[in-house]
Amino acid sequence: MKKEELRLIFMGTADFAVPALRALVENGYQVKAVVTMPDKPMGRGHKVSPSMVKLYAQELGLPILQPDNLNEESFLDELRTYQPHLQIVVAFRMLPRSVWQMPPMGTINLHGSLLPMYRGAAPINHAIRHGDTETGVTTFRLRHEIDTGEVLLQEKLPIGHEETFGELYERMATLGASVLVHTVDLFLEGEPVSIPQEQLPGYVGARPAPKIFKDDCRIDWDKPAEEVHNFIRSISPAPTAWTKLHRPGMESIVLKIYRTQVIEREPRHRGRFGSIIWDKKNLDVMTRKGVIRILSLQMPGKKQMDAASFLNGFALSSDMYIE
């Protein structure tokens, strides 16, 4: 089959999916329609806004479907009118069987991990949080159980020791777009080979990567410095790690922490975890084992700033601590 004959439906919502859609179109594939979530309130002002995928699809002039319910017969009927050979899912939502079984070639998904590692909604975050030095992307055939389908292609990607979620997210989206195009290329040649996840070389079982909520983002300083550092960078810039600066006799302040550095893995300073060590330029916090240097943070109602700016405008005292 030729590229111009292969009819594709693309399903995605988050900005992670935009490079994948762009790559398919720029490589000559015929995306007949884009399925994305309905417009919804976003941000502090709760302004009703479209998804990033919808905005890009509008630029391309592609038909856009925004069903509230993926099982609605009206949506299924409209989807059938495009007679897709293959459906592609990137950063979307769980599909009912009636949708993913519709195309004769099936439905494939791009996932931000080396499956079966980190099945779930937040694979990139969890890879950083666990201190992994390597991750990757996977394309696989969609099945009913989430992220369990047979693997088509995988490609590895190193994780920098100081790399944040936001930085890795962008690199993963770019890599994923390339791997997805190569995967769709395989369908032009016939039925691609796919491998059950439990038969992959080095298989040691699955690891979950559940969605991360704001309530999960408080920093626990009663952990080794390396774990605290990984936790903070795994959710930077969003949903953002936070902690409380306690000021005796005054209300505590919530601080958002964006970037840190491990300066001591073995404790040389004595004191309780959460104790603060500072000078004119550096803001350090003791953990259960080792010391973390805060490089970038944010106070309520203020912009993100470096530690030196914070110290220049905020008077710390020896009886204050972080928890």
UniProtKB/Swiss-Prot annotation:
Keywords: Protein biosynthesis, Transferase
E.C. code: 2.1.2.9
Record-linked CDD domains: FMT_core_Met-tRNA-FMT_N, Met_tRNA_FMT_C
Domain of life: Bacteria
InterPro entries assigned: Fmt (IPR005794), Formyl_trans_C (IPR005793), Formyl_transf_N (IPR002376), Formyl_transf_N_sf (IPR036477), Formyl_transferase-like_C_sf (IPR011034), Met-tRNA-FMT_C (IPR044135), Met-tRNA-FMT_N (IPR041711)
Reactions it catalyzes: L-methionyl-tRNA(fMet) + (6R)-10-formyltetrahydrofolate = N-formyl-L-methionyl-tRNA(fMet) + (6S)-5,6,7,8-tetrahydrofolate + H(+)
Pfam families attached to this UniProt entry: Formyl_trans_C (PF02911), Formyl_trans_N (PF00551)
Binding residues for (6S)-5,6,7,8-tetrahydrofolate: 113-116
Task performed by this protein: Attaches a formyl group to the free amino group of methionyl-tRNA(fMet). The formyl group appears to play a dual role in the initiator identity of N-formylmethionyl-tRNA by promoting its recognition by IF2 and preventing the misappropriation of this tRNA by the elongation apparatus.
Family membership noted in the UniProt record: Belongs to the Fmt family.
Protein name, UniProt field: Methionyl-tRNA formyltransferase
Organism of provenance: Porphyromonas gingivalis (strain ATCC 33277 / DSM 20709 / CIP 103683 / JCM 12257 / NCTC 11834 / 2561)
The encoding gene: fmt
